[in-house]
């Protein structure tokens, strides 16, 4: 779906294939590009999706979540084909959330890096705001991350034209702006 407004429930889905862009496109997600004003509940996802060369707000599940509660559980990656990359606001699950809360649990991103591809960036931005789970959580409401494994490379190539290029990179969340509580438990981040 390109976008949703209101409540959405999606269960038991497999995402495969690839999407390629030439430094254009925004609000791009494996399931939803843009989600607004509701509760989005997406569960039991297996993916080997590859999104390459998009501009901004790119996620393996949803590109941009606004004014919502986003729930994602049982998200599994067990293939070296998985890759999410673009210019800015890049995340394995969500590129950007704004004025939203999230509950993300039971995530396994297991893209094992071999010696041969040790320099490959799997979840990356050419500019900024990139996270293993969410690229940017702005004005974040109370949220949680639990039972999360991110075993892959996350980074920025720092080749963007923005003066802040290469900033805001995180194993879980690239950038988070909130005065609310975010519970994080049982998480593991590794590049190997």
Spans of features found by a protein language model:
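Surface-exposed loop/turn motifs in large extracellular/passenger domains
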Residues: 1-192
């Amino acid at each position: 779906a390109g976008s949703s407004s209101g409540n959405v429930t999606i269960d038991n889905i497999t995402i495969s294939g690839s999407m390629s862009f030439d430094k254009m496109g925004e609000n791009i997600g494996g399931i939803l590009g843009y989600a607004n004003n509701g509760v989005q509940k997406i569960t039991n996802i297996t993916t080997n999706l590859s999104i390459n060369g998009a501009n901004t707000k790119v996620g393996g599940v949803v590109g941009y979540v606004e004014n919502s509660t986003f729930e994602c559980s049982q998200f599994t990656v067990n293939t070296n084909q998985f890759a999410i990359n673009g210019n800015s606001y890049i995340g394995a699950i969500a590129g950007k959330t704004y004025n939203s809360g999230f509950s993300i649990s039971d995530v396994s991103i297991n893209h094992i890096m071999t010696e041969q591809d040790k320099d490959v960036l799997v979840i990356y931005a050419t500019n900024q705001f990139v996270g293993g789970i969410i690229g940017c959580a702005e004005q974040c409401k109370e949220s949680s991350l639990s039972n999360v494994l991110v075993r892959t490379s996350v980074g920025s190539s720092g080749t963007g034209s923005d003066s802040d290029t290469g900033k805001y990179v995180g194993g879980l969340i690239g950038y988070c702006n909130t005065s609310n509580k975010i519970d994080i438990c049982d998480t593991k981040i590794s590049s190997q």
